[in-house]
């Protein structure tokens, strides 16, 4: 899930105490569903070739909040494509284990050993408050489905004293009432990954967990302490009733559904990164904030978009006869130096596909019975997966290769072996921990007490790594995403996931 974007922090700002009364307008995310398909907002772009491939901008929120507003041609493009790529492989157990490892302090170290005493005590006090409030924050529907407060708290904050400070900061920002209430329903990108797997599509990822994780771990200690302190200040102000959050997940959903997300982002900063430098900060803290801003812009936006774009290009050239559906955080397609810009510089024609425009079918394929939109995408009642104390089985069976070498129907080429996707075993035991338990939603973090630009995108990543035939966790890495896909604060991170049923998220 990111971030995973994987993970971008939501920029929140500290406002005068009197402004707090404005908090929590519940109807802000509501948007009237347009009667005509052509009136819906579209986050679909077509890569013009035969067969065509597509970019689709996702958002890291429960899919049920946005699904009815996604145009039919976007859903049809998903069905028509034989290969679906995400920022990260949200269904691969390796993603979970890699996230866990990335977030942990070196062996033998604990937070109490590395944090200043006053910050550690404030952090511990805040987590005790959250644990106390968790039963009150949960909805009757969540409790009715067997989700318990203690389980949920431990799934999110378990072993927090062993985590690196930067990940604790992100964790704190995912332990809010709004986020807790949203758990139990897959976020949009995870839902698409589950559907792709259910439909036996070949899937892959353009990024690896490490690519989203390492940039965050690359911040120096003083920068991380600055960010964690600002985060705790914000949460303490929220508890005291003196803080108003100007942009929330509800606002993000409204902008995504109603079609003004781009204008919101671009009106703040065309580069998608918030100018989170607060003029009220002391001079030295302003310098620290500027350093973080510069580092995150470079590592999490510009370098990432360039890397993802080149990996997409490599896939398109490797398999010219295959139709791809690339589902990345919508923030990757907005502003300057986007993934779209990278592909266009490489000579590809990429155009926006408005809602209501028919999808080009491309080369004729063997006739086969294909599910309809109504049967595939009928929203289902989400089921909560309760982890059992058993480990994931490492075995799996593989699907037949979807890519055939010209002139050889039996012998798979080396390229074919790269893109085989494992099929999840139907009898696999439940996982001990879930993807959402490990990713932290960056979208709603706020490191600097000042509102910045909302940025959608929740995942980040690194090197090109392709699985070999028979590779157990089969993490096909040719790029990645998350999605971190929400808002961006001083501390841009990944939104592949640590929040909803599986952000960052």
Swiss-Prot record:
InterPro entries: TIKI1/2-like (IPR040230), TraB/PrgY/GumN_fam (IPR002816). The chain crosses the membrane at residues 478-498. Residues 1-19 form the signal peptide. It is a single-pass type I membrane protein. It holds the Pfam family TraB_PrgY_gumN. It comes from the Eukaryota. Residues 20-477 are extracellular. CDD domains: Tiki. The keyword ATP-binding does not apply. One of its GO terms (cellular component) is organelle membrane. Residues 389-428 are annotated as: Disordered. GO terms for biological process: head development; negative regulation of Wnt signaling pathway; positive regulation of protein-containing complex assembly; proteolysis; Wnt signaling pathway. Keywords: Cell membrane, Glycoprotein, Hydrolase, Membrane, Metal-binding, Metalloprotease, Protease, Signal, Transmembrane, Transmembrane helix, Wnt signaling pathway. Divalent metal cations. Mn(2+) or Co(2+). It is found in: Cell membrane. One of its GO terms (molecular function) is metalloendopeptidase activity. Residues 499-505 are cytoplasmic. The keyword ATP-binding does not apply. Its EC number is 3.4.-.-. Glycans are attached at residues 220, 229, 278, 336. It is an enzyme of class 3 (hydrolase). Its cofactor is Mn(2+); Co(2+). Metalloprotease that acts as a negative regulator of the Wnt signaling pathway by mediating the cleavage of the 8 N-terminal residues of a subset of Wnt proteins. Following cleavage, Wnt proteins become oxidized and form large disulfide-bond oligomers, leading to their inactivation. Able to cleave WNT3A, WNT5, but not WNT11. Required for head formation. Belongs to the TIKI family. Was named TIKI in reference to large-headed humanoid in Polynesian mythology. This is Metalloprotease TIKI1. The lineage of its organism: Eukaryota, Metazoa, Chordata, Craniata, Vertebrata. The gene is TRABD2A.
């Amino acid at each position: 899930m990111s971030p995973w974007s994987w993970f971008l922090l939501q920029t929140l700002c500290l406002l005068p105490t009197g402004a707090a009364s404005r908090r929590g307008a519940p109807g802000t995310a509501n948007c009237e569903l347009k009667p005509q398909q052509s009136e819906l907002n579209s986050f679909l772009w077509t890569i013009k070739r035969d067969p065509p491939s597509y970019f689709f901008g996702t958002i890291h929120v429960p899919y049920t909040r946005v699904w009815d507003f996604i145009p039919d041609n976007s859903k049809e493009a998903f069905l028509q494509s034989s290969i679906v790529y995400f920022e990260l492989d949200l269904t691969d157990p390796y993603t979970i284990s890699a996230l866990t490892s990335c977030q942990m302090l070196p062996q033998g170290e604990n937070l109490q050993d590395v944090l200043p005493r006053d910050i550690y005590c404030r952090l511990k006090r805040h987590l005790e408050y959250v644990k106390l409030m968790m039963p009150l924050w949960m909805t009757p529907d969540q409790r009715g489905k067997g989700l318990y407060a203690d389980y949920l708290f431990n799934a999110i904050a378990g072993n927090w004293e062993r985590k690196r400070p930067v990940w604790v900061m992100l964790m704190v920002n995912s332990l809010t009432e709004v986020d807790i209430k949203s758990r139990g329903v897959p976020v949009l990108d995870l839902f698409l990954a589950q559907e792709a797997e259910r439909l036996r599509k070949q899937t892959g990822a353009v990024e690896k967990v490490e690519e989203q994780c390492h940039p965050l771990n690359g911040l120096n200690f003083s920068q991380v302490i600055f960010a964690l302190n600002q985060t705790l200040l914000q949460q303490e102000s929220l508890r005291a009733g003196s803080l108003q959050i100007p942009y929330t997940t509800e606002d993000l959903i409204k902008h995504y559904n109603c079609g003004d997300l781009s204008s919101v982002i671009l009106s703040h900063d065309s580069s998608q990164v918030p100018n989170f430098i607060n003029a009220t900060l002391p001079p030295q803290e302003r310098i620290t904030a500027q350093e973080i801003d510069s580092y995150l812009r470079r590592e999490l936006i510009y370098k990432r978009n360039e890397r993802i774009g080149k990996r997409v290009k490599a896939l398109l050239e490797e398999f010219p006869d295959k139709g791809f559906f690339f589902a990345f955080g919508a923030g990757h397609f907005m502003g300057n130096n986007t993934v779209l810009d990278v592909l266009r510089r490489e000579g590809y024609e990429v155009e926006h596909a408005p809602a209501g425009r028919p999808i080009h079918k491309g080369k004729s394929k063997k006739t086969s019975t294909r599910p309809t939109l109504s049967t595939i995408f009928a929203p289902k009642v989400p089921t909560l997966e309760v982890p059992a104390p058993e480990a994931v089985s490492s075995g799996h069976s593989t699907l037949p290769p979807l890519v055939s070498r010209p002139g050889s129907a039996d012998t798979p080429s080396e390229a074919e072996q790269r893109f085989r996707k494992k099929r999840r075993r139907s009898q696999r035991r439940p996982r001990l921990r879930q993807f959402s338990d490990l990713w932290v939603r960056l979208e709603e973090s706020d490191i600097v007490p000042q509102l910045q630009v909302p940025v959608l995108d929740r995942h980040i990543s690194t090197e090109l790594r392709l699985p070999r035939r028979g590779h157990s966790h089969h993490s096909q890495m040719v790029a990645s995403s998350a999605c971190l896909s929400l808002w961006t604060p001083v501390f841009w991170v990944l939104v592949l996931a640590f929040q909803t049923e599986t952000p960052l998220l």
